[in-house]
Curated annotation (Swiss-Prot):
UniProt xrefs under InterPro entries: Beta-defensin (IPR050544), Beta_defensin_dom (IPR025933)
Family: Belongs to the beta-defensin family.
Keywords, comma-separated and alphabetical: Antibiotic, Antimicrobial, Cleavage on pair of basic residues, Defensin, Disulfide bond, Secreted, Signal
Compartmental location: Secreted
Any single Gene Ontology cellular-component annotation: extracellular region
Protein name: Beta-defensin 127
One Pfam short name: Defensin_beta_2
Propeptide stretch(es), residue numbers: 66-99
């Protein structure tokens, strides 16, 4: 009867924090902390426990395609006629430099 109680207690115990598979990375791509990453996973960073944060390659590529920002168009400089007049007025003429 004592052996049955010991086995029952061991079966119903929850695993400790180190035995559980920890989640890592960010909100968009979830990874798992492992000593060795699987074939379809890539190590991106270190977890708190010194293991690798293994991310699924397909999920990572899909996230990069979605979150890739579009390049902004370069700003164009448009000068008005008044801008040209002020530039010409402030530019020293050749006659004043030669005398």
């Amino acid at each position: 009867m004592g052996l049955f109680m010991i086995i029952a207690i061991l079966l119903f115990q929850k695993p400790t924090v180190t035995e559980q598979l920890k989640k890592c990375w960010n909100n968009y791509v979830q990874g798992h902390c492992r000593k060795i990453c699987r074939v379809n996973e890539v190590p991106e960073a270190l977890c708190e426990n010194g293991r690798y944060c293994c991310l699924n390659i397909k999920e990572l590529e899909a996230c990069k395609k979605i979150t890739k920002p579009s390049h902004p168009k370069p700003a164009t400089l448009a000068l008005t006629l008044q801008d040209y007049v002020t530039i010409i007025e402030n530019f020293p003429s050749l006659k004043t430099q030669s005398t």
